[in-house]
Amino acid sequence: MRKFEMSTKASTMRATVIKLHLFVAAFFAPILLMVALSGGLYLIGSKGTTERVALAVPETIVFDEGATDLKAEVSDLLRQLGQPTDFEYLKTSGKTLITRPTSRTGFEITRNEAGLSVTEVRPDWIKTIVELHKGHGPTLFKNFQKVMAVGLLFIVISGLWLGLTAKGLRQNTLLTSAAGAIIFLLLALS
């Protein structure tokens, strides 16, 4: 009787893990497909493009790139130019300030010998998903990506566990996992 109880508990746990595995995989399928698509496109050289539009900046506009609250200074500049100010944060690249996220239309602000230049940068759909993949999207999306990473770990670990604990799948699971690990190591270390 005790063996039957253990078997029933084990099969109930297995059924629960299978359901969780399937639900988590289904829930994260859209973002995992986006990551696979954007990563694949990026690796074959299709990184997307941006349309860049130089904005007219009147000489009367004052902009202090040394301001204590640079985000407020950039927001004020964009407001004076009649542009949206809904960026989340700034990235500095050399002498250029870049509004983030870069997964949507943003701006680059540069001071050079000719004065202040502001460029509107509009990504196409490929550039948008590549930027999301790289973690350059909105903060809420980046937090979702962190949760998705945990979900992906669960999907892989639960899939391995399900394969290793099923007598009929154990050998194939071990062989396939070993082959994947060997190929990964050979390619990564080559």
Segments the model singles out, each with a brief description of its role:
Residues T85-I109:
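Exposed beta-strand-loop-beta-strand "reactive/processing" segments of non-cytosolic proteins
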